[in-house]
Every structure is written in C-alpha cells, then in structure tokens.
C-alpha cells in the first residue's frame, strides 16, 4: 500500500511545484528589482542630446483623435518605448484592439469605462433580457424570447487612473461623460513579451486606422469571406460586415444612442458595489459641443434583469482567482496615496508591483510628482529603468547630465511635452512659479531611484571625511553638505533666492524666448 501511495504523492508534488513556478513567472515573482525582463536597447545608442517631444502626427476618427509621437526617433528606439495620446469625445467608443507590447495608460482628464478581456477567464457579468414579440403582443399573445449577454469585468476609469495593458490582451474604452477623455499610452516595445520587431503594433478587432501611409484594416479583413463565415458560424453577409471594408469611421466611433452593457454601481459615499449592475447610457441633461443626440430609453416591450456573476454555480481554479480577478487600474492622483509629502514643496506617489500587482504582467511602473511653486526635486538617477516623463500641468526647469558630466538637456518642460530620461543619467528638476505636475513611466515593475541629497540619500550615507577629501572642502562644509537637506525627502523647499534673471540660463539659450504653455 505504501509503495502505491509514494508515486501518487510524488506526482502531485511535481504538479504543485510546476504550477507554483508558473504562477511565480506569470506574476513576476522571479524578478528582483535588480533584474529586468527587457531585451535591452539598441547597441551603439547614444543619449548625447535629449529633447522634449510633442506628437508628430494625428489620425482623426469619427469621435476622437489619436496622436503619435515619433517612435522612429533614436531616443525612443534606444529606450525601447512607444508613446501615443488619444482623445475620445463624449459618446466615443475606442474599438476593441490589442497590442504586441505591454503598456500603461494614464487618464489625463475625463471619465468612462474600459474593459480588458483575458483569455480563459469567465464572463462574470451576466445580463438577461426578455424581448417581447411586438406582432404577437398586438394579437393578445404575450410570448417572449429570453436573451442573454455575458461579458468580462468592466472597469470605471477617471482622471488620475493608471490602467495596465498586458501584451496581447484585448481592450476597449467608452466615454460616458460630458467631456473628452484624454489618455497617454506608453508601451515597452523592448519587453520580452514582444517577440516581433521593436515597435508598437495595433491589432484591431473592428474598424480601421490610417496610421501609416497605407490604410490599416482590422484582423478579419485578411481572411476570405467564405472561410471566415464558416469559422464564426455566421452568414457571408455578416462576415463582410465585420471585415469593415467600407467603414471610414476609424478606430474611435460615436455611439450616438448610448452604449448599453453591465457596469458596477458606483456610490458617491463609498466604494464600488459589485452586486448591483446597470446599463450604460449617455448623459441626457448635458448639452456640449460634443453631444450629438440624447440617450434612448429601453425599447418598448423590453424588460431587463441583471444578475451578478458572483451567484454562478461554477468552480474557480487558482488561475482564475489570481489572474482573472486582478485590478486593471489604480488611481495615482489621490493625495491620500502619496508616499512622500512636504506641505511646502509637494508630494510624490509611486505605483509598483507591491501596491499594484497587475504591473507584474506589464513589467512597468509609474511615479506621479506634484511640485509646488519653485519647489525643487532632489537630484537623482534611475537605477534599474528608463523613464518617460510627461508634463501634466505647469512648467519645470529640467537638467540632465550624462556619465561624462555633460549636460544633455537643459530646458523648460511644458504641459503636454514628453522627455525620455535614460537609465543612470542624473536629473534635477525645479518647478516654475505656477508649479508643475508630471507622471513618469518606468520600464520595470519596481523602479529604484538613488537620491543625491536629503534623507536616505547618497550624501547622507557617506562619511564626513570622505566628502571633505573628495571635494577638498572643510569638515564644516562637508557637514553642511551632508545635513542641510538631511530632514527632507524627495521634494525640497527652495532655500536660496535667485539673483537676477540668469538662473539656469546659459548664454544664447533660446528657451527664454519661448512662450508659456498656458
């Protein structure tokens, strides 16, 4: 009897270790902050001269705009990132699509809903219709037809949210508000999840997009109508429609009558109630330049019943419980989430795989910084990641220095501009009079920075005599250098008044003549 139990025990032990290892690999537990899942940048890359970027071109759709930054630029290629910015107008629907590389989305403004479709996960949102036959109803017969719709979880998004987009995962977005949704997408094309060429590719499930010179169509357009209709079990006429051959609306379409699907009820006083679901309908009482029509009420003779997916009589395995229930978004703008706060300088908020586990799937992280008037950020360098800095509001003087001690960037970064800061390059930032807010996207799920000044900084950690001999200064000066910012962390209050208008400005620098962004 003992001999028969041992092989079974050994078999189940192997299965447990295999599953445990697979889950650890899936959620990034095999990576330490000092390791990277990236393929590395192009060899021979040089970040000798950095520049602030703005969108290079625009693609107009029926209900929005997609703006592309120049991913062919050497700085984007060397950092292995691709950036786009989308504007989705009210009642606009970003059609389902997926990408070859993982990415992060930051919602600059607006609100709406987004859905991420994970393969193999159950459709936990269930909707039941009772559609009445109008002809039979007129004849006194009350026969009805039961219809059913199931879909995966839908997430409410708003300003300040960061949404994680794993590679190959279908996502869509709908604007149910009265103002446009503006979102920045940053993709890590050098991530190991991308085994295609190191550039961002969009795979549309519907619609089309004229990103390049040629007109890009959705993935169904390349199949023959006959084979497609047979594979999907639909008529050839329906197969031709989903190919969107003559659809000129683009990738963002307008749903003028409102979009209906199940959503979690959001309470004003509390968190999301997962047991109550409602259909989406556009705002009727709002009248803006983006509004096309009013939202329809339910069709006559139609009743709707909602059922929470929690009541399903269905067993869940470990993958569904850990993978399918992951949160797709976190809000990084909430002041209560700040990791460091100085009431006279500003606050810093980090999103990493520790407080946002889904980032293990995309192997990226984000940091949002709010600097008050004339506040300065401690000089630092990124230890294990490149950084893509996007200015949300205000202006800041940014200086970046390379390993030769040469200034590779020294300019004012304005609202809407983007700056790529290479790994290990030292950066110094100071807010202008109006202050500034920006977000930095990092190419690792647990980004690490090394501050030069302040609490827990490099200068604070070095002995006084090491500083005195290294810089040929007195012990008192060394003590001041080490401790003057010793009680501050991250964001500093300005201590020394600037003399004249020559602060940070090199002779002949043209940035002083540039106009303000606002």
UniProtKB/Swiss-Prot annotation:
It comes from the Eukaryota. One of its GO terms (biological process) is seed development. Disulfide bonds join 45-78, 121-324. Residues 281-295 have a biased composition (Low complexity). Residues 281-311, 496-518 are annotated as: Disordered. Coiled coil: none annotated. Residues 296-311 have a biased composition (Polar residues). The keyword Signal applies. Residues 50-240, 330-479 form the Cupin type-1 domain. GO terms for molecular function: nutrient reservoir activity. Gene3D superfamilies: Jelly Rolls (2.60.120.10). Residues 1-24 form the signal peptide. SUPFAM superfamilies: RmlC-like cupins. The keyword Ion transport does not apply. SMART domains: Cupin_1 (SM00835). InterPro entries: 11S_seedstore_CS, 11S_seedstore_pln, Cupin_1, RmlC-like_jellyroll, RmlC_Cupin_sf, Seed_Storage-Functional. Keywords: Disulfide bond, Seed storage protein, Signal, Storage protein. Hexamer; each subunit is composed of an acidic and a basic chain derived from a single precursor and linked by a disulfide bond. This is a seed storage protein. Belongs to the 11S seed storage protein (globulins) family. This is 12S seed storage globulin 1. It comes from Avena sativa.
């Amino acid at each position: 009897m003992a001999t028969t139990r041992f092989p079974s025990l050994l078999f189940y032990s192997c299965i447990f270790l295999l599953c445990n290892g697979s889950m650890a690999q899936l959620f990034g537990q095999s990576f330490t902050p000092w390791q990277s899942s990236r393929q590395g940048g192009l060899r021979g890359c040089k970040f000798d001269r950095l520049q602030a970027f703005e969108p290079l071109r625009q693609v107009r759709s029926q209900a929005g705009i997609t703006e592309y930054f120049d991913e062919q630029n050497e700085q984007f290629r060397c950092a292995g990132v691709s950036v786009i910015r989308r504007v989705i107008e009210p009642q606009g629907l970003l059609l389902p699509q997926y990408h070859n590389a993982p990415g992060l989305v930051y919602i600059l403004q607006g609100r709406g809903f987004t859905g991420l479709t994970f393969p193999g996960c159950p459709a936990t949102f269930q909707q039941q219709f009772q559609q009445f036959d109008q002809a039979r109803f007129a004849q006194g017969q009350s026969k009805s037809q039961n219809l059913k719709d199931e879909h995966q979880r839908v997430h409410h998004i708003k300003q300040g949210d960061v949404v994680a987009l794993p590679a190959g995962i279908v996502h869509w977005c709908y604007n149910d508000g009265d103002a446009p949704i503006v979102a920045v997408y940053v993709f890590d094309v050098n991530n190991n999840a991308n085994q295609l060429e190191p550039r961002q590719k969009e795979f549309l499930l519907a619609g089309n997009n004229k990103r390049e010179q040629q007109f890009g169509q959705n993935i169904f357009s390349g199949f023959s109508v006959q084979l497609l209709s047979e594979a999907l079990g639909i008529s050839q006429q329906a197969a031709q429609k989903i190919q969107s051959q003559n659809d000129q609306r683009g990738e963002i379409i307008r749903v003028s009558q409102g979009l209906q699907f199940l959503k979690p009820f959001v309470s004003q006083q509390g968190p999301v109630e997962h047991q109550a679901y409602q259909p989406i309908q556009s705002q009727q009482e709002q009248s803006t330049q983006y509004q096309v029509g009013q939202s329809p009420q339910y069709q006559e003779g139609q009743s709707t019943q909602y059922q929470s997916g929690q009541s399903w009589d269905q067993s869940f395995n470990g993958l569904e419980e850990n993978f399918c229930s992951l949160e797709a978004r976190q809000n990084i703008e909430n002041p209560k989430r700040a990791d460091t706060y100085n009431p006279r300088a500003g606050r810093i908020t980090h999103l990493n795989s520790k407080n946002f586990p889904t980032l293990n799937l995309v192997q990226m992280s984000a940091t949002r910084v709010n600097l008050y008037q004339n506040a300065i950020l401690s000089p630092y360098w990124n230890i294990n990641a490149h950084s893509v800095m996007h200015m949300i509001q205000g202006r800041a003087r940014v200086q970046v220095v390379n390993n030769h001690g040469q200034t590779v960037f020294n300019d004012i970064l304005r609202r809407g501009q983007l700056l790529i800061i290479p790994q290990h390059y030292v950066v110094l930032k100071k807010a202008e009079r109006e202050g500034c807010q920006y977000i930095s996207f990092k190419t690792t799920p647990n980004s690490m920075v090394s501050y030069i000044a302040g609490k827990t900084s490099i200068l604070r950690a070095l002995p006084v005599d090491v500083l005195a001999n290294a810089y040929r200064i007195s012990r008192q000066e060394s003590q001041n250098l080490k401790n003057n910012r010793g009680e501050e962390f991250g964001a500093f209050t300005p201590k020394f008044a600037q003399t004249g208008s020559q602060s940070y400005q090199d002779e002949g620098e043209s940035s002083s003549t540039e106009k303000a962004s606002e």
